[in-house]
């Protein structure tokens, strides 16, 4: 992982502009988590690519080919079917200290495994695994967001200063940002972005069910159907992430371009 390059990146205004475009929806995400569980809210974040495709088509007049249309259809079909049949509910459990500890151990271990896998192999392989590690960190940050909204309802804003959950948002979010930056620099954005948009909702669903008591339909058949719809959604996201039109106009791509420019400047100096 490139700590020295991060220092160069942080001094460039273009990088901060790209970062702000990625974080602009933070407040809306908190508001959504205040109203719904992780298994409902986090999968909706994949609609970023769908709306990007629609904006490119109807606002900027960019022609969308079969790849973009096919990816949008698959993603919408998988996401809509999952939300319709998975019977989300619950999510009212307040995690205890043991629950948080087990979640942190599991997610840190999973992220560490992803990082270790990212240290070797081809550039797409490394980029994908760094992206998966970043997605896990962002899912953990969302879990801390959800818990923080519960704390505010119970004790008001001052209670945030006396609990660890708000600080967990910052720690997990910064870790995710650092890992995502390494993912963008390690290889093609098609690999890193696919990992980010697929692993984040999947990790969030697992955390929501295991930590907050979110409900999915019971039974092997129902769970298999849930898995099939998520697989369909993931396939659509992979198709969209390999679209030159989508990738070259995404906020992540702007971050990559700024970072690569900084890397060249750092090497030249």
What are these regions (language model features)?
Residues 1-269:
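Polytopic alpha-helical membrane proteins, predominantly small-molecule transporters/carriers
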């Amino acid at each position: 992982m490139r700590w020295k390059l991060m220092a160069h990146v942080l001094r460039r205004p273009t990088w901060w502009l790209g970062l702000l475009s990625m974080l602009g929806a933070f407040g809306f995400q908190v508001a959504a988590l205040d109203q719904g569980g992780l298994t409902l809210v986090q999968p909706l974040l994949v609609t970023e690519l769908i709306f990007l495709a629609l904006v490119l088509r109807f606002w900027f007049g960019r022609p969308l080919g079969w790849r973009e249309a096919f990816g949008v259809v698959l993603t919408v079909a998988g996401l809509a079917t999952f939300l319709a049949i998975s019977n989300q509910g619950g999510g009212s459990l307040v995690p205890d200290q043991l629950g948080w500890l087990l979640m942190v151990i599991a997610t840190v271990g999973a992220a560490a495994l992803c990082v270790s896998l990212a240290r070797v192999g081809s550039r797409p392989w490394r980029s994908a695994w760094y992206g998966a590690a970043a997605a896990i960190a962002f899912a953990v940050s969302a879990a801390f967001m959800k818990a923080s909204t519960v704390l505010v309802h119970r004790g008001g804003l001052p209670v945030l200063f006396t609990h660890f959950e708000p600080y967990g948002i910052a720690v997990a979010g910064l870790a995710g940002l650092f890992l995502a930056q390494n993912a963008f620099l390690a290889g093609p954005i098609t690999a890193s972005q696919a990992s980010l948009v697929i692993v984040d909702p999947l990790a969030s669903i697992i955390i929501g069910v295991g930590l907050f008591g979110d409900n999915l339909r019971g039974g092997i058949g129902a769970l298999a159907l849930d898995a099939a719809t998520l697989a369909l959604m993931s396939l659509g996201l992979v198709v969209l992430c390999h679209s030159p039109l989508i990738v070259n106009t995404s906020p992540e791509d702007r971050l990559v371009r700024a970072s690569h420019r900084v890397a060249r400047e750092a090497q030249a100096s």
